[in-house]
Amino acid sequence: RHRSFEQMRRASIGRDDDERRRLVRAMFQSIGMNSLEWLHSTGWSDERVMEHIEFPEHEPGEAERAAGNGQINITAHMGNWEIFPRAYGIHTRRRLMILMAPQRSPKLNDWIVRTRSRGFELVMTEEGALKPLRTLRRGDIVALLADQDSTRNPGIFVDFFARPAYTPSGPAHLAYRTGAAILPMVIM
């Protein structure tokens, strides 16, 4: 919580420290709620998933998919990022590959892989770029969380709220090598 509070202060988010504390509390409550929703949804049918998720009438990527081009979806740890890829794959009727960094705990990693991999292919980032390249060249979708400050993967530092933040370069390399569009997405 302290780190989140300090980051909000540096970014001038909130009128004062009291408001920042309320925002941090609300953020952690939201993460808890999203986690419970995800756990609850793991047994849902595709139809039930789509009863709870709406997509805009004209959403980004429609033209790319219609042309048969690959698509790179980038999201962040916002909203229910765990439910989104499954719903998006159902919505687009396209094969979806998720790139995932392995967790430190093998037991947690195995559990996450089992629960996340329903309805799409899950590939560990350490496996390299060959599978994502093939997926994009087939005209399918690769999705990843790009807001993690991890120097395990190639990237560069860019200023974010006046501080250097590590930004992975993998999505740009995949787009360059395949011509796939990069689409930022979020579920709210």
Give the residues covered by each predicted segment.
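Short, hydrophobic/aromatic alpha-helical segments in well-folded domains
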Residues: 60, 84, 111, 128-131, ...
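Membrane-associated lipid acylation/remodeling enzymes share a hydrophobic transmembrane-juxtamembrane segment
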Residues: 127-188
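Catalytic core of membrane glycerolipid acyltransferases/transacylases, capturing the structured
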Residues: 16, 67-127, 138, 149-163
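Membrane-anchoring hydrophobic helices of lipid-metabolizing enzymes
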Residues: 1-75, 80, 107-120
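Short secondary-structure boundary/capping segments
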Residues: 62-63, 88, 133-134
